[in-house]
Amino acid sequence: MEKRVLAFDFGASSGRAIIGHFDGENIRLEEVHRFSNDPVSVNGTLYWDVLRLFFEIKQGLTKAKLAGGFDSIGIDTWGVDFGLLDEFGCLLENPIHYRDARTAGMIEEVFRTVPREELYSRTGIQFMELNTLFQLCALKKYRPHILDRADKMLFMPDLFAYMLTGRKQSEYSIATTSQMVDIKTKDWAYDILDRLGIPSGILTPIVPSGTENGMLSAEICEELGLDPVKVVSVCGHDTQSAITAVPSELDSFAFLSSGTWSLFGTEIPEPIVNNTSLSINITNEGGYGGMTGLLKNIIGLWLIQESRRQWKREGEDYSYADLERMALSAEPFKCFIDPDSPEFTPPGDIPGRVREFCRKTGQYVPQTVGEIMRCIYESLAMKYRSTFSMIKECTGRDYPDIHVIGGGTKDTLLCQMTANACNVPVKAGPIEATVLGNIAVQLLSSGDIPDIKKAREIISRSEALREYAPCDTDKWAGAYESFLKILK
C-alpha cells in the first residue's frame, strides 16, 4: 500500500507543500502548493510575515487533502530565527529576519562575557552575527521589554508545528543553529546563557529528529475538514534535511547544499572542535540520528539573485539564463570578491558593492553585467575550493567527488566551475534534496524505511543525477592563488 506524507519546505524567499508518494521502492514528489515568502520592513525592522505563512500552510493542507490525503506532516525552514510566546501561548511579535541589522557588533559584545574560544568549544558553531544567540543578546539590549514578557521561544519549524498541534518543543537540528546547545550534552548550554542574561526559562526541551510532535489539533481539523494525522519533527533546519537526502553510498562524503546560502561540508559521527576548526570558523551542526554536519556557511546564490533584483530595479529584467550567458562571454579570472565579506549580506546594490570591493582590493573593476556575473560565479567556485580544503584539513580525509544538492544543481555553469575549481567530479542532484530529506525522516519515523542508509539508496534510485568532470584545472589552480590574496 502506498504511503503518502506531506512536506512543508520553507526557504528564504518561497515555500512549498509537496506530497511524497512512497511505494516501498521509490519516492515520487507531487507539488500541491507554492507560495512566496516575503519579509516586511516596518519602521526599520525586518520581519517575517508569519501569519501569512501559516495561512499558506493551511492552504497546503487543504490542497493536499483534495489531492488524496496524507499520513503525516513534516516542516523544515531556514535556521536561527524564532518566535516568542507569552504565558498564554500567544505570539508576542512577528519573528525578526536574520538579515535585520540589530545584531551588528553583538559578537564582540558577547566575547567580553564569554570568550571566543570558550563559546566555540562548548557549542562548536561557526560565528555569524545572525545566530540566535546574538539575536537574543540584541533583543536583551535594545528591546528588553519583549524578552521580559516571553514565556517560551520556538524556532520557525517548531513554531509552525506548535500552531498545528499546540505542543512546544525544540527539534535538535534547528536548535543547534542557535549557538546555544552544548555540543557534548546535546542540551542547552544553560550556564553560558545565564552569564549573558538570557532567561533559560524560555527554552523548550530538545527532541531528536524524527520525534512525533503530536497530532493535528481538533481546531485545525474542524476548520479544514481534516482527519487527525501526526506532525513529525523532521530535521527542522533545511540544511540537515538536505544532508539526509545526499545520495551517497559512502559513509564519508562531501556535499554542497546550493541555494540562497551555500552549505559546504561533510557528515561525521562526532563533532570536531579543536584549534584548527576554531581558526577556520567551521560549524558542527546537529543532524539525523545524532550525526554531525561539519560545514561552512557561505553566501551562495543570494549574490546572483540580489544582483538580478538590483538590475530589475534599474529597469533591466534579465533572466537567469541571460546572466549565465553573459558571464560565459566575459573574460575569465579578471577579478574576485570574497562572497562572505559583510557588505554582501544585506539586500541592495550587490553589483555596486562588487565594483567597490574590487576597487578597494586593487583589482580590475568590472564594468559590464557579464563581467560582474563572471566575477561572482568564479568567486563562488573559488570559495568552494577554499572551503573544500578546510573540510579535508579538519577531517584528515580526501573525498573523491562533491555531491551538489538543492536548487543550485540547476545552475550548470556554477556546477561546472565548482568541478573545475575543486578538481574533483561534481555529482549534481537531487534538486529537491530538502524535501526528500523531510519526507525520508517522516518515513523513518513511521518505520516504512528501516535506516538512513536505505533512505539514501531509495533517493538515489528515485532521482536522476548529472555529473560534471573537472576541466582546465591548471588554469583554475593558477587563478586560485590570485583569489587567496584578496581573502587576506
Ranges and model annotations:
Residues 6-7, 19, 104, 111-123, ...:
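Active-site core segments that coordinate phosphate-bearing ligands/cofactors
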Residues 62-97, 126-130, 161-182, 205-208:
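Short beta-strand-loop/turn "lid" adjacent to the catalytic site in phosphate-handling enzymes
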Residues 69-77, 152, 205, 397-406:
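Short glycine-rich phosphate-binding loop at a beta-alpha junction
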Residues 1-93, 121, 221-231, 422-424:
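N-terminal glycine/serine-rich phosphate-binding loop of ATP-dependent small-molecule kinases
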Residues 100:
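Carbohydrate-associated surface elements
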Residues 11-13, 71, 76-78, 132, ...:
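Short, basic and Ser/Thr-rich N-terminal targeting/leader segments
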Residues 52-65, 185-191, 383-390:
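Short, well-ordered amphipathic alpha-helical segments that serve as non-catalytic structural scaffolds
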Residues 76-80, 209-210, 258-261, 401-409:
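Glycine-rich beta-strand-to-loop/alpha-helix junction loops that act as flexible
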